[in-house]
A protein has these predicted regions:
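Solvent-exposed loop and edge beta-strand segments that line ligand/cofactor-binding
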Residues: 2, 36-46, 109-119, 187
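Active-site lining segments of carbohydrate-active enzymes
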Residues: 60-63, 67-134, 140
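Short, well-structured active-site flanking segments
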Residues: 21-30, 65-66, 136-144, 177-186
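Acidic/polar, glycine-enriched structural segments that form the non-catalytic walls/loops
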Residues: 1-43, 61-83, 153
Length: 187
């Protein structure tokens, strides 16, 4: 088992280095060495993104961690909207299973796999940010991305105060609300 975990770790690290560009690596990246394919090379949030970014902090890939922050920040407004649209929640986040990396609206609904009920997404996506803080301490990052500057009204972000803590609070609010009898009934 330790050998398998080591292989997964190095496979993820390879995917991150070979395919990430300035953001997290896409699903197809590890197969073709490309990160901006014209076909639906989605970011698969419930597995591929997390496996591929798992080695970034422990390997000292600071820039990859910063790219992951931009990837997350670009999507948070849609995550908040997803929680409101699917569950009627306020100040909470619901992460989709797949995203194009720029927007993250819930668009996949399937009777065989209930994509819209992947409730563990926020915690899953927070882990690399927590590890970034554990590895590098408090950091301030700067973007030159006009869309992020427009979205947030600034170009610098304190990773703990502007990214991690607000997202953690929204994840907490999700679980606090879903534990409410309005969403959950013990039968």
């Amino acid at each position: 088992m330790p050998h398998l975990l080591e292989k997964l770790y190095y496979n993820g690290l390879y995917g991150m280095q070979a395919c990430a560009g300035t953001t997290a690596p896409r699903l197809s990246g590890l197969w073709v060495g490309e990160w901006n394919l014209l076909w639906r090379s989605a970011y698969t949030m419930d597995a591929n993104v997390n496996i591929q970014v798992s080695g970034m902090n422990g390997s000292g890939l600071y820039e990859a961690g910063v790219g992951y922050m931009w990837f997350i920040l670009r999507q948070i407004p849609d995550w908040v909207n997803n929680a409101a649209m699917v569950y009627g929640m306020k100040d909470a986040v619901l992460i989709p299973v797949n995203t194009d990396g720029h927007r993250a609206m819930m668009v996949e609904y399937d009777i065989n796999y209930p994509f819209q009920y992947w409730n563990a997404g926020a915690g899953w996506m927070l882990i690399p940010i927590y590890e970034f803080l554990q590895t590098y301490g408090d950091a301030v990052i700067t973007t030159f991305d006009a869309s992020l500057i427009k979205m947030y009204g600034k170009d610098t972000f304190d990773v703990r105060k502007d990214v991690y803590e607000p997202l953690l609070k929204k994840a907490y609010n999700f679980w606090k609300q879903i534990g409410n009898p309005e969403y959950y009934t013990d039968t």
